[in-house]
Amino acid sequence: MKLSKKVEKLIHQLDMSKLPTHLGIIPDGNRRWAKKHGKPPSYGHLKGRYVFERILKFIVRKLPGIKIITIYAMSLDNFLKRSSRERTFLFKLFKESFRKLKKEKLIHELKVKVSFFGKLEMLPADLLKVMEELLLATKDYNERFLNFCICYDGREEISHACKEIAEKVLRKEISPEEIDENLVKNHLYTKGFSPPDLIIRSGGEKRISSFLLYDVGYSELYFSEKLWPEFDEIELLKAIIDYEKRERRFGK
């Protein structure tokens, strides 16, 4: 991967010991970027996929301290509100991306395990099949982790966990007194993963849109004005440099 001098310069400004262990990304702005260029939404989604693939490779190759990457690929709200035509196109893109990931040498060389979070049962069977193949291909890896939130909503994740816990109480597998924040965490889609240290959102909107709600209490947030198809390594590094300058207090 050939890097520009500016990217190399920014990399040298990083303290590799202070990189966020868990990076969350909300890649917002594909549709607005397409509209700005007089193109249909599909054009923005295609460009956005290319940006995701490039950013992912950059992180995995150049920022080894980032062990967990969680991408907000499609919110449940977006799934419900997008037209059938746009959803079909997005599902096609997901299938293509996941097939490419399964064959990507870097994923296997660096032992990147892939996971999916969300109401996955709402997805079409052909997409689920491709996702399952990717899961199986990486299930034994444990060096790095790549998580995709699809048909995901943080409130739904919490309510899903509550239902599972309530069922266990009814079956007398646990008592109400045993319910605490750790028990709830262990019933979330994200169980086993530490909370995000840094969440980057592109597109200029300053909100988290129900992303990893249970886990983001002490996450650092960075809002980029760049639309996702405009996002690049320079913008990523600026966000991480900004993060490293912050003093994380964790409520103290």
Where are these regions (language model features)?
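Flexible, compositionally biased loop and terminal segments
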Residues: 1-252
